[in-house]
């Protein structure tokens, strides 16, 4: 879906709309640790999370860990993966390292990072549409392929919840998802289109 409707009353540059279109379709591609079918299933779970009875009840609780139950899932993804998706989409401010480590123990560190990054990328694009009163995009078609499950070199324990690149010249926000570079690229593209514009971030005057 190209952002044609808001362009009639709000000036949106081509880099922004083109980035949304490109990134959205690539979310449906086979990832490093999840297949295209699994990634699109995860995207369906992101939207389902907002009408999930368990998520709604947890949001009203003093602590989400006080509420037990099953998510209203719409996929056959692993239970822990669904929990990651729903909680990250609806209540990210109350996630804990202890909880994250349990999920990682179940699905693996790299799959955790890829899935979390996918949720964040989709959340930005969906929220952008909601803020402009636009219908949400149709989920992309799952693309074929098999995950290569290759862990990149140069990553390790830097004191975060997950392994990251040990290159200290990068800001934490720039290396948060570096354990899965291909999916991290999608996040970087969104950040640059919406906010930093890459090298232009250092310029004191932005011509937007």
Annotate each predicted stretch with a short phrase.
Residues 1-208:
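Hydrophobic alpha-helical segments
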């Amino acid at each position: 879906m190209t952002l044609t409707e808001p362009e009639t009353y709000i000036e949106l540059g081509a880099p922004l709309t083109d980035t949304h279109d490109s990134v959205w379709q690539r979310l449906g591609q086979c990832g490093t640790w999840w297949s295209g079918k699994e990634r699109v299933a995860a995207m369906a779970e992101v939207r389902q999370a907002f009408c999930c009875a368990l998520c709604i009840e947890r949001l009203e609780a003093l602590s989400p860990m006080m509420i037990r139950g099953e998510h209203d899932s719409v996929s056959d993804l692993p239970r822990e993966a669904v929990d990651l998706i729903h909680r990250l989409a609806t209540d990210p401010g109350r996630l804990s390292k202890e909880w994250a480590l349990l999920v990682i123990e179940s699905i693996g560190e790299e799959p955790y990072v890829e899935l979390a990054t996918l949720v964040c990328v989709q959340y930005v694009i969906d929220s952008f549409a909601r803020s402009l009163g636009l219908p949400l995009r149709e989920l992309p078609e799952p693309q074929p392929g098999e995950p290569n499950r290759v862990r990149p070199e140069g990553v390790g324990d830097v004191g975060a919840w997950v392994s990251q690149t040990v290159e200290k010249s990068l800001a934490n926000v720039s290396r948060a998802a570096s354990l899965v570079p291909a999916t991290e690229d999608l996040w970087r593209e969104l950040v640059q289109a919406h906010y930093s514009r890459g090298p232009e971030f250092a310029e004191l005057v932005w011509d937007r």
